[in-house]
Amino acid sequence: MLRFATFIIAMMAMSGIAGAQSFPADILNTPVDGSVASWIIRTFGLLTVLSVAPGILIMVTSFPRFVIAFAILRSGMGLATTPSNMIMVSLALFMTFYVMAPTFDRAWRDGIDPLLKNEISETDAMQRMSEPFREFMVANTRDKDLQLFIDIAREKGQTVVVDEKVDLRAVVPAFMISEIRRGFEIGFLIMLPFLVIDLIVATITMAMGMMMLPPTAISLPFKILFFVLIDGWNLLVGSLVRSFI
């Protein structure tokens, strides 16, 4: 976990460097020539990039698929706040660390570690760190989604394929679309058994003339019992982790 924390901090710093290459090296040193306004603008720009970096890092990992599946599970069971958002996000984060461990290790070994040893420049380190993530995203992105952004770039006269490698500008949005789609596909399969339980309970209550009684109030205990009996968390988490290449 310590390596993961260090990796994320380094990625945030490197994202700031990559997004603000025009900033001088002494950006955090107060200017003495009176250019306070320029210094404030540069500092604000760097802090803005650093604040966005964690969100960017999450979007290029397996995190979105996990969160979508957990949210649909909670909705299908009819539970409004249980498990809480904090629990679901925390579980999704730790599952992301587990799935992305090989990618993190490679990015650390190829990019961050040589940079800390002053063996490569910041630009080279950023390229080496992004390569494992690019390969992970390409492997888990539908060809149709990836081709969509390649075609859009071609229509605008832009080139996103260099030396048979697709640029991150096309890979990241294509990967996110694919992840959202897969999350909904998994969510549909999760919802089906709970929908069947709701229909059975609703049919029984209607046959008994209890039309004023909400079927969800009766079906909720049965859905929870069903999920526990089939060891739902084990099946769901195992399927989600194995769904990644």
From Swiss-Prot:
Q: Which keywords are on file for this protein?
A: Bacterial flagellum, Bacterial flagellum biogenesis, Bacterial flagellum protein export, Cell membrane, Membrane, Protein transport, Transmembrane, Transmembrane helix, Transport
NCBIfam families documented for this protein: fliP, PRK12797.1
What does UniProt give as GO cellular component?
Answer: bacterial-type flagellum basal body; plasma membrane
Residue spans crossing the bilayer: 4-24, 44-64, 84-104, 186-206, 210-230
Organism equals Rhizobium meliloti (strain 1021)
Name of the molecule in the record: Flagellar biosynthetic protein FliP
**So which domain of life are we looking at?**
Bacteria
Could you confirm whether the keyword Calcium appears in this record?
A: no
What family, per the record? Belongs to the FliP/MopC/SpaP family.
Localisation per UniProt entry: Cell membrane; Bacterial flagellum basal body
Enumerate the Pfam families for this protein.
FliP (PF00813)
Q: Tell me the lineage of the source organism.
A: Bacteria, Pseudomonadati, Pseudomonadota, Alphaproteobacteria, Hyphomicrobiales
